[in-house]
Structures are given as C-alpha cells and as structure tokens.
C-alpha cells in the first residue's frame, strides 16, 4: 500500500482514521478526537458506511486482521460493555481487538477490551502487571495462533 498524499494531524483520532481509511479525516467525520465530536460536518466521530477501512479491504482479500493497543475512534456514547458496537474495531474490519478505546489509560490498571468484552487483568500492579508487555504478549499469541490454525492465510495486525 502506498500513501501519496498523507499527513498527520495534531490529534490521534483524526490521524488514525485517515491512516485506516486512506481519506482525509474531515471527510470521514474525524476532524477532532472523539470526546470533541459534535453534529458539525466532519466532526461527528461517526465512521460513515461508505468509508471502508484498510482492515475491511484486507479481510475481503484473504487476510486475517487484528488491532492491538489504543483505538480512540469509537464515539464516546458507544464506549461501554453494553454497546452498541457499531464503531468498534471488530465492526470496522478487524477480526480481533485487544486494547483500550479511549484517549489514554493507565499502564497499571487499564480498562481493556478483548473484542467487545471487558478484560479482567491477570494480575495486579503489585504482582507485576504492566500494559505494554500485556499488549505485546496478546499480539504475539494472536500471530502464533493464526500461524498454527491457518498457515496458508495471510495476517495483518
């Protein structure tokens, strides 16, 4: 894939939306971070149905897809275990998601989701839990499971 007119924004949500869609962030409703969304065109933080994500394109072409870590492209009213899950990573082409949905989280007691299910952390900070190694471990596990279960299928995470 080649981006020939890509630019980063001063904010994470717009940059991520542009990177995942190949479009200008305002064109797909991400002119600001999700917490700053409003009804103005280009600022809704609602991924339009006509904007296909790179994950969807890859999945349609035989790739397995997963996202790990910070997402921050789900409207704030959807960020809860009850959903709706219309704008979560698993609704935008990613077959698997392990990470957090907000702008930031703590390294020691993060609010994580596996797909759309809240995650109970395997240990406390006092027992040595840290977010970054946990994300790496889950990404590695996904790659190894993918390789073992579908060795002929391509994967992207």
Regions found by a protein language model. Name each.
Residues 1-157:
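Formylglycine-dependent sulfatase
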